[in-house]
Amino acid sequence: MSFSSLSEYISSLGDKEKEYILRFIKLMESEYPKLKLRFSFSMPMWWFGEKMKDGYVGVSATKSRFTLHVSSESYVRDIEKERPELKYGKQCVSISYKTEEDFLFLEKKAREFVSINIGEK
């Protein structure tokens, strides 16, 4: 489904999906206030430069999965070596909503990826 705004996207989510998305947005706003939240490809994203090709991190949620999207396939492959039981796409890592540990792991990996790309924290 395609959404035209972040508020429209968030209002379409169920409780758990909304919780995870809002937690991630809060994390990014508090730890990386210089990165501007964008709504692109029907998901919240933070670009590391003026254009998406400069690198990005984003998140999306479905009824069964929360997904971290990054601009590096090699970074996703590195995560896969560490946690092969998670679900992987070309530039994304997905978790179910079953454990808090998995969400905290994705938060950690997002922080690491952002820090590598913007040189902070």
Language model feature labels by segment:
Residues M1-K121:
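Charge-dense, helix-prone N-terminal extensions
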